[in-house]
Amino acid sequence: GMIALGNPEGSDKASQLISIASSLGLKSSIVTSGPGENFESFNHGAIDWKEKMAMAHWVVNSMSMLTAGPSPAMAWSASMTFAELEGCRNVMIVDTPSDPESISMVWGQVIEKVRQIHVLFFTSHSLHAISELEGLDAHDFLSRVREKTLIPLVCGYSESDSCARVAHALDNIQAQSSGESEGLRWLAGFLKALPLSGAGIEGIRAAASWE
């Protein structure tokens, strides 16, 4: 299964991933504020992460959640720490915050968490923005990020050629993708297939080309 920290409207990238994963038959749920609570200041300490993670293989967060207010930012950090303790795998969707000025600040906070992240995914928009920020060529950006951070799977979707890419220590994989929802549909299917396809490079290749 899969859980994600999302806003109550379901308009963020992590919530979108959850609804796509559900439509693909993966048991998925969103962790958010309670009814009547203000999302930016909700009581995040009341979340029972242990219980939420009991059936989850993946815990999903999005980078822009850091700009949603103090409570979401603290829940963002807590969820990753609990995922490690509970034996879940952390997935980080790198998306672009609504205020482009804050991108270097939030990307810096993701970098501080790399040790806890198993799958890092860039939307095509953020791939362009962050490669520019880091002064890296977009062409080999994913493998450079993987070398720098040692995150096991660094993925991204590129709209220009409708391709999903996965950088792994043993290979750089390319898969044609419909590109629905900025590549999130590809990511949902990839995350659904990965636990079943085996951890070896062949399994990762098979999971990447699930479409």
Question: What role is predicted for each listed range?
Answer:
Residues 1-180, 191-210:
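Ribokinase/PfkB-type carbohydrate-kinase core domain
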Residues 181, 185:
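Enzymes that process phosphate groups on RNA ends and nucleotide/triphosphate substrates
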Residues 186-190:
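Conserved hydrophobic/aromatic "anchor" residues
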